[in-house]
Amino acid sequence: MTVSSHRLELLSPARDAAIAREAILHGADAVYIGGPGFGARHNASNSLKDIAELVPFAHRYGAKIFVTLNTILHDDELEPAQRLITDLYQTGVDALIVQDMGILELDIPPIELHASTQCDIRTVEKAKFLSDVGFTQIVLARELNLEQIRAIHQATDATIEFFIHGALCVAYSGQCYISHAQTGRSANRGDCSQACRLPYTLKDDQGRVVSYEKHLLS
C-alpha cells in the first residue's frame, strides 16, 4: 500500500451551514461541522434543522457531511450524547468525528465513526487500535512528519486524514491542559481560552526582564 494508491479527499471546516455550502460549491469533497452539542468548538454549533437541510445539499454535489462530537464527555452526558447521535443519524450525515471512547459503549445506530485529532494519534499502535475497534477514518495528530504518516498509513486499513492548513497548537493534540489550569476552561471540553497565543513577559531568576510582551508560546 502506498500513499499514491488512494484518491485524495479535500475536507473543509465550517462554522455554520452557510460556510459549509460555500465550501462545497468551491470544491470541498467533505465538510466537518459542529452539531448542537459536544463539539470542540462550543461557539460553532448548528441545529439539527440546519444540518438536516445541509445534508441533501451536500449529497447533491457528491460531498459528505461529518459532524464533530469530539469532546470528553461527563458521565451524565452519555445518554444525551446517545440521543444526539441518533438524531444526527436520522438527518443523514455521513459520519461523526469523536474523541471520547465511551461512545463505543453506547447503543447507537450504524453510523461511521472517525477518530478526532483530539485522540492524539501519533503511533502505529494507537492507529491500529482505533481501526480495530471500528473507526473507519482517523485524523492524525498535527505534529507528525511524512515518515510517521506513511508508517501509520501502511499499518492500518482505516482512511487517514491529516491537517494541511490552519492553526497549529503548541501542545500535542488533545493533551494540552494550559487553559484548564489557568482559567478552568478545558480545551477537551470545547472551551479553550487559547492562553498559548497571548503575549507574556519572561523574567530570569533575578527578576530581570528577558523578553517583554512577546508571544513566547506560539
Task: Give a label for each model feature.
Residues 115, 119-160:
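Internal, well-ordered domain-core segments that constitute the primary functional module
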Residues 2-121, 153-218:
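Active-site pocket-lining/capping segments in soluble small-molecule metabolic enzymes
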